[in-house]
Amino acid sequence: MSQLPVAWLLSPDNGQALRLSAAGELQSLDSSYSYPFVDGLAVLLPRAQPLPDYAVHYQQDAELFDYGDEWAGDPLAQTDNRRLREQIVAALPPAEDLLLLDVGCGSGWLAAAVLPRGHRLVSMDISTVNPAKALQKMPSERHYGLVADAMQLPFVPELFDVIVASEVIEHVKDPAAFVASLLSRLKPGGRLLITTPYDEKIQYCLCIHCNKPTPHSAHLHSFTPRKLLALLPESLRPVASAFGFANNYLLKSRLQYLLRFLPAATWRLLDKLANKLAGKPLRLMMIVRKPTAGPYNTSSPK
């Protein structure tokens, strides 16, 4: 594990550059905010206000559930999850020595996929549990961990070559602000990859504690390609694409599992054909290629 370069970081409270204090914490230049290290991880969550409810929820969620083992014992789900990850890896640029940000890193699967290729990666989550697991799973001088909120990213602008947010956007309160936050940290010429369930019919149950309707899996939003692209500023829509994948019929008929031996590229062709002929994709991907020159902006649409 490597310590994140301080030059990459900003205070999530006042946007100032950070420095290491005599106490061994990260501190804003005016000394008004300090941020601790927990088990070697920088915790750059805002200090000026109490943590929002969603932050507390997902911190507790990470402590209770190990999503690295979520599909253990379910070979169909394991195969589906593997194909999702292959789809993301296939969308990465072919360049060498990329600097990537994994937003909501979970078990650290992306680290296992990209570090052997010589890339650098920041595994980021709102809890300390998941980045710590990711670093333990894939220790490397090119692997960094961070505890932070994607809505208040503590990075200097235009830092990353690639930002991946897989199965995250359906959970956030303000998807447009979420996308704008990610785009602001993406280099010109960089690539943003977002995946989410396709046109999900969100189901609710009655919470036994508050007696209010609560969405299953904490999914707050459902997206189609058009809805996902609408989150982008108009200037970036021409350089973005959104498409469905992971055909439902192939999953339910067990063909996805029976053909699990197929190479990733061959499977993607079969899946694309099934979605073209029969429809019913289960997942959605948006790829945004940020222009190398303006005029463009990364703010959320009004």
Enumerate the language-model features and the residues they cover.
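Conserved N-terminal segment of class I S-adenosyl-L-methionine
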Residues: 1-156, 162-166, 176-179, 218, ...
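S-adenosyl-L-methionine-dependent methyltransferase catalytic module, highlighting the catalytic core
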Residues: 126, 130-133, 137-138, 173-185, ...
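Active-site micro-motifs of SAM-dependent methyltransferase domains
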Residues: 152, 170, 230
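Residues lining the SAM
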Residues: 166-169, 195
